[in-house]
Amino acid sequence: MTRYTEGNVALLPALAADLVRLNVDLIVVGGVRYVGVLAAKQATTTIPIVMESLATDPVAAGLVESLARPGGNITGFTIMTIEMAGKRLELFKAAVPTLGRVAVLSAAANPGNVLHAHAVQTAGQALGVTVQLWGVRGTEDFERVFAALRAERPDGLYMPGGPLTGTNEKRIVDFAVTSGFPLVRDSREAVEAGAFMSYAYDIVDQSRRLASYVDRILQGAKPADLPIQQPMKFELIINLKTAQALGLTIPPTLLFQADEVIR
């Protein structure tokens, strides 16, 4: 059985309570935000909870005792999206050697997005790239930010994932392409939609590992004893069609490194 918030996180406590009432054998919490896991944790201390793709440090968030031995009834997977911010920006710079200014477009009300944006800014200092932070507070705020970016003309855009940016994915990608901005994301779907490049965890590999954990728990393993795991495989995906539309020539060495090139 499945329960969805339809984008309304206020529904999470009721949805978690409903699953507990139904006495399910296990709860898998999807999505990158910790609030879903927190709602499940507050609803039950006995039903096993498996995190699918948490973007927050679960120890710092108070969800588990440690990565090696979570304790309690929660285990699962993180996606290291913030930790990979520097590598993502480094690859962006390798793809566009003239990259001097990057605008990070993120959800201002999303704590994970804010941390992610600051991680990109820190990485930029080491790479000689000026990183400008642009916070979007809601869907109605995009046009204001788009107009400002057209005036500022950064060399590229970087967008962390999240509910707000994900819901407006096509709108943002279309803006980037029509305005002449290469856009770097942390999801395959964004590049397939027309974004310039993505460097992110391999979702297929992560899903297989998630299924293995679910099976082990249903066979009797305790979540407290199963370490929190991080991604083992990452994918570099480049949209060559978008690069050509933007007039960019990707260095052959980087194309060779790519796991997938969309032509």
Question: What is each residue range found by the language model?
Answer:
Residues 1-263:
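Short hydrophobic alpha-helices and adjacent helix-cap/hinge residues
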